[in-house]
Amino acid sequence: FGHPHRRFATIHVAGTNGKGSCSHTLAAILQASGLKVGLFTSPHLVDFRERIRVNGKMVSEKYVIDFVEEHRSFFEPLHPSFFELTTAMAFKYFAEQEVDVAVVEVGLGGRLDCTNIISPELAIITNISFDHTQFLGDTLAKIATEKAGVIKPETPVIIGEYTEETRPVFESKAMQENAPITFAQDDKEILTATPNTGQGFDYETKDFGRLHGELGGYYQERNANTVLCACRQLISMGIIKDHDCIKKGFANVTETTGLRGRWERIQTSPTVIC
């Protein structure tokens, strides 16, 4: 495919929980700043095409069908996994759509994940807990080692949350790669979080004023803090130009990026939450 992943900037998002919320919020912010944004996430909730979006719009059914049919003879001898095939499709689609930047969510782990072929502008590791232990290891330190594989030479990395077991792993890998590292847990951007009239929270922040957060769930405060630390880095890199796009992005994640199933109210009588 001619290395399509080299034709656009990327932000790589790893971690056990919060990847989807952080990825969609970052995409909403980048779109609000006027960029053409690719978004690659998994798994999908209803439709496979949710995984691959440009400015919130899902890849077309025709593109998916044509991609598989056109390249079937190439793929069949290789026996790629479902996720490897999907990743190749996403990167090719983003390149053809000429996106400015793509937010790329890791599928599993990090070090050996096929998305780790990218050389991102920024890496984010949301948190570490026990998941996929048969593949990633049976201790938090082992799991952190796999996820720390997304830390690249001289590439800034944001760590959302850490434990006494995982922090040394991240510090060691960042030092090895000469990568600037920020621990969002210690560098609080969120000062207060107050439930708002919607499903989400209004945040008083250290550097970005008052933000109306759309996403619900008590855990979104931690996700928001991670995203804001990432935004501060992206501002310093000139990728995000101002604070206004951050306000717009936080307030319009679902409409802008199509995010579903994050403490989403889908019925009121009776109340049904997805």
Placement of each model-derived feature along the sequence:
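Walker A (P-loop) phosphate-binding motif
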Residues: 1-45, 122-124
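ATP-dependent carboxylate-amine ligase catalytic core
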Residues: 3-6, 32-118, 134-136, 165
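Nucleotide phosphate-binding/pyrophosphate-handling subdomain across enzymes
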Residues: 7, 96, 101-106, 114-124, ...
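Short glycine/serine/threonine/alanine-rich loop segments
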Residues: 35, 155, 177-181
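Extended acidic/charged loop-beta regions that coordinate divalent cations
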Residues: 43, 86-135, 167-210, 259
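Membrane-proximal helix-turn-helix segments that form the acceptor-binding/catalytic region
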Residues: 144-153
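Short loop-to-beta-strand entry elements in the cores of soluble alpha/beta enzymes
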Residues: 152-161
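Beta-strand->loop->alpha-helix junctions that form or flank phosphate-binding loops
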Residues: 160-161, 173-195, 214-218, 247-255, ...
